[in-house]
Amino acid sequence: MAPGRAPTTAWIGFDTALGLCALAWGDGGLTGSQLPEVDSSNSEALRRHMADRFPGVPQCLNPAEAPAEIQALSVAVAAQLGGELVDLPTVRLDMHGVPPFEARVYAETLRLGPGQTMTYGELAYRLGEPSAARAVGQALGHNPFAPVVPCHRVVGAGGKMVGFSAPGGVQMKQRMLDLETRAVGGQGDLF
């Protein structure tokens, strides 16, 4: 458990078109999520990764036993990563222990809809911190809630695909953006 975080109760793994993902929760809501591993079919890799992030927290093997909001979120994330145009359901994010600046970055990032992008600098400007583009990038690099907090929609200056610390790196970021662009009626590559 991260310092200052509320306890995580359990996590579920679920399949998507891009590979296995996971959602973790506790009494405070969603405590974390995991985008597909590089070896997207490797359930053991997912279990190891979740065990590293949430030591001692059990995997919920029956998704029907997860809270209703987590069940709905897993279905929506799978649909989104399968190329469907869906708005993810609103879930409580456990922000205990999240530094205030990072919480502000996540709140502003949540305003970006499918197919929309913004640069790190534009996001910093929206936060009233126009010289904080690098700090915005670092905050998004710490994002424990991807893709619920859609950090993949924040890009480098000029639309460059930079700064994606999730498994698969910038290639995964580009795949996710391409799926969303097609879903909203675009042709793929955003830039």
Model-derived regions: residue spans:
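Basic nucleic-acid-binding alpha-helical/helix-turn surface characteristic of O6-alkylguanine DNA
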Residues: 1-130, 179-191
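Histidine- and aromatic-rich ligand-binding microenvironments
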Residues: 113-116, 144-147, 159
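Short Lys/Arg-enriched helix C-cap and helix-to-coil transition segments
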Residues: 147-154
